[in-house]
Amino acid sequence: MSDVYLSIIIPVYNGETTIQSLFNQIDDFCKKNQFKFEVIFVWDCGIDNSWKVIEAIQLKHPGVVCGIHLSRNFGQHNAILAGINKASGNYIITMDEDLQHDPKDILLLLDKQKSTNAD
């Protein structure tokens, strides 16, 4: 069993303006809850500078942030699958890059999993 508790996969397509803020929210949430975590950004060949932002976050947070650079645009589902293949956490969560998911809601998902013993 992995020592990483939570893998958070974020498919990225033109998320240059949101992914730093999203990572900061995830980082704060996981540290507050004392979760050992990893964030896997999967860049799906958008047309903005998302990959440069991912590289910068990865440099600041080695061992926590992983960037996957897809060779072309494969679509959101395939980007998620690429992230799942890289994930090492006991639990895997997917989040969109555009801040529509609040990292605090991760607790609701984990509580539901524990109360129902869901996969």
Q: What is each stretch, according to the model?
A:
Residues 1-119:
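Structured catalytic core of nucleotide-sugar glycosyltransferases
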